[in-house]
């Protein structure tokens, strides 16, 4: 193992670990930075269940008490994000093996991690390895550093790849939500063992109105160390929305057409309201791509179930700040959080003279009822434990005045001044195109947003 004089780098720590120098003395995170996400706007892969699955047996060993664990840096040691990565799971579970608070996938010495492909594995199958190409689940065992053992052979963790991208699904469940007006969907992976579903998020969606009320998932302290450079995908219908061309509905051409029809004017007369720079509606992620750690998790965010029309100036402005600051807060206090991200209401579009304000939808049904509403508000609820939480809200209307915001968009008492970690939350009265933010108590918020689970009414403490 090579060492260099640049001893402060974390790369050197990996090499030191490979020669068994005590983990508790040298383990650190110097030089590592949480990645700032790019703007997320964009077809998922259809999910099929593989048949004829072969599972490699679990290998049991006795770990040496003084042997350090294998440490996989989620930002450096995983396969490149353009390569088809497997799922990284805790053995015989439906849970991802998530990184520790410093962003390392930590596997105890002698223990196994479960890797899952929906097709064949690359590199590890064939007559020379004794592993069938029908194998869909393998359980390599930690040796040291980033080196693992499988069927008697040694591999670097980056070598474990699938021959094709792991396929995920969006499944409609039998459960309803939003007071029985909407349907609960789950997003994730059907693992080949019967009954195992690895969920990345679940979604409360109104099929009739094409509105997602909320997306629920978990943030962990290691979420700030999400895998960087995962390619953005085109948003997918994920085998749903069969009656609609969702890409066309979100197109800027359709936005201008619907706005012109709404205000009874020509598209050319809407330059004050819509342009191609930042005054247009993007496919706004609810669960952000960067809220997910592994590439396989991040790709599941590119479904229209996890999107709503969001003004780009807000998407890349104040709302991006909310996403970043929440991840940073969770990392700082080293506690996991349940996260609900959703939308409320319908934004009203103004005429040029501001005398007319009408609800803005990107589609309509046969009876001209509005579908795919442009939300008035985006919100993110974070809950820690049973009773502590907070709601962060953002106004999705770059044309609203301060007066309109205070009278129409602030739907619960603003408590941001009571929360020290929200000191970054500021609004510039002269420039509200990036968005207007405020914060509320969870139990007060759900009184005006009944689509949320009733148990959130028990969250009565502010998350300080």
Where do the PLM segments sit?
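Domain-level detector for secreted/extracellular nuclease and nuclease-toxin modules, and
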Residues: 3-4, 10-464
């Amino acid at each position: 193992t090579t060492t260099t004089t640049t001893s402060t780098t974390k790369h050197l720590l990996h090499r030191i670990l490979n020669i068994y120098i005590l983990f508790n003395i040298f383990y650190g995170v110097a030089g590592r930075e949480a990645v700032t996400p790019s703007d997320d706007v964009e077809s998922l892969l259809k999910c099929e269940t593989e048949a004829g699955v072969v599972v490699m047996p679990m290998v049991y060993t006795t770990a040496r008490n003084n042997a350090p664990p294998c440490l996989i840096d989620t930002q450096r040691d995983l396969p490149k994000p353009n390569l088809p990565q497997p799922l990284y799971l805790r053995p015989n579970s439906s849970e991802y093996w998530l990184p520790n608070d410093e962003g390392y996938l930590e596997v105890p010495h002698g223990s196994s991690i479960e890797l899952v492909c929906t097709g064949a594995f690359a590199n590890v199958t064939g007559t020379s390895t004794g592993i069938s190409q029908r194998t869909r689940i393998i359980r390599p065992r930690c040796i040291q550093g980033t080196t693992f053992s499988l069927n008697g052979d040694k591999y670097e963790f980056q070598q474990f790849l699938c021959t094709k991208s792991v396929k995920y699904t969006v499944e409609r469940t039998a459960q309803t939500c939003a007071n029985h007006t909407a349907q609960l969907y789950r997003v994730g992976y059907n693992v080949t063992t019967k009954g195992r579903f690895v969920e990345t998020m679940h979604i409360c969606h109104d099929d009739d109105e094409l509105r997602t009320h909320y997306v629920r998932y978990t943030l962990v302290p290691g979420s700030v160390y999400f895998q960087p450079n995962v390619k953005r995908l085109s948003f997918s219908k994920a085998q749903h929305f069969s009656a609609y061309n969702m890409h066309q509905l979100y197109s800027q051409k359709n936005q201008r057409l619907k706005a012109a029809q709404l205000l009874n004017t020509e598209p050319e007369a809407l330059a004050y309201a819509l342009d191609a720079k930042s005054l247009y509606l993007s496919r706004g992620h609810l669960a952000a791509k960067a809220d997910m750690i592994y590439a396989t998790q991040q790709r599941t965010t590119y479904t229209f179930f996890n999107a709503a029309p969001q003004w780009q100036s807000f998407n890349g402005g104040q709302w991006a700040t909310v996403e970043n600051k929440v991840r940073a807060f969770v990392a700082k206090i080293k506690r996991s959080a349940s996260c609900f991200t959703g939308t409320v209401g319908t934004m009203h579009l103004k005429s040029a003279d501001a005398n007319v304000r009408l609800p803005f939808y990107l589609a309509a049904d046969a009876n001209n009822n509005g579908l795919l509403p442009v939300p008035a508000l985006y919100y993110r609820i974070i809950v820690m434990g049973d009773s502590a939480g907070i709601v962060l809200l953002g106004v999705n209307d770059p044309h609203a005045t301060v007066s309109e915001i205070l009278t129409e968009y602030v739907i619960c008492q603003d408590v941001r001044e009571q929360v020290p970690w929200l000191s970054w939350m500021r609004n510039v009265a002269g420039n509200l195109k990036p968005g207007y933010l405020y914060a509320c108590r969870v139990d007060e918020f759900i009184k005006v947003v009944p689509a949320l689970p009733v148990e959130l009414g028990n969250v009565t403490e502010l998350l300080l």
